[in-house]
Amino acid sequence: MIFVDTNVFMYAVGRDHPLRMPAREFLEHSLEHQDRLVTSAEAMQELLNAYVPVGRNSTLDSALTLVRALTEIWPVEAADVAHARTLHHRHPGLGARDLLHLACCQRRGVTRIKTFDHTLASAFRS
């Protein structure tokens, strides 16, 4: 089970960027190998937060379509928020959203994470 962070979807559907192809290749490889990809409703909210204020509705729609097509989407539960709070002392460099991603992963037994955020990836491995 692989948790897919918001930035993977953003790079996959976004403007030209050095991480665009690695994001797309990861998603294609996962699809070919029938990897179980998961994410959370919080990741979808992050897409809204990134694209709505700048009027990039078409990109938002593409990203949301990709999320729904390729991943199992978890709700964020009160227990996830409570666990995120307990993780803050171990990972003070993570923001609230990444703490929530980490909490969702830990509570559901995620074995791998795909993110281009080195801080989140490091916290996941620790």
From Swiss-Prot:
Keywords associated with the record: Hydrolase, Magnesium, Metal-binding, Nuclease, Toxin-antitoxin system
Database matches in SUPFAM superfamilies: PIN domain-like
Query: What positions does the domain PINc occupy?
Result: 2-118
The EC number(s) this enzyme carries: 3.1.-.-
User: What InterPro entries does the record tag this protein with?
Assistant: PIN-like_dom_sf, PIN_dom, PINc/VapC_TA, VapC_family
CDD domains of this UniProt entry? PIN_VapC-like
Its top-level enzyme class, in one word, is: hydrolase
- What residues does Mg(2+) bind to? D5, D98
- State any single GO MF term: magnesium ion binding
**Gene3D superfamilies linked:** 5'-nuclease
Where are the bilayer-spanning segments? none
What single Pfam family name could you report for this chain, choosing any that match?
PIN
The coenzyme or cofactor needed here is: Mg(2+)
**Family to which the UniProt record says this protein belongs:** Belongs to the PINc/VapC protein family.
**Any idea what job this protein has?**
Toxic component of a type II toxin-antitoxin (TA) system. An RNase. The cognate antitoxin is VapB23.
Q: What is this protein called?
A: Ribonuclease VapC23
Organism from which the protein derives = Mycobacterium tuberculosis (strain CDC 1551 / Oshkosh)
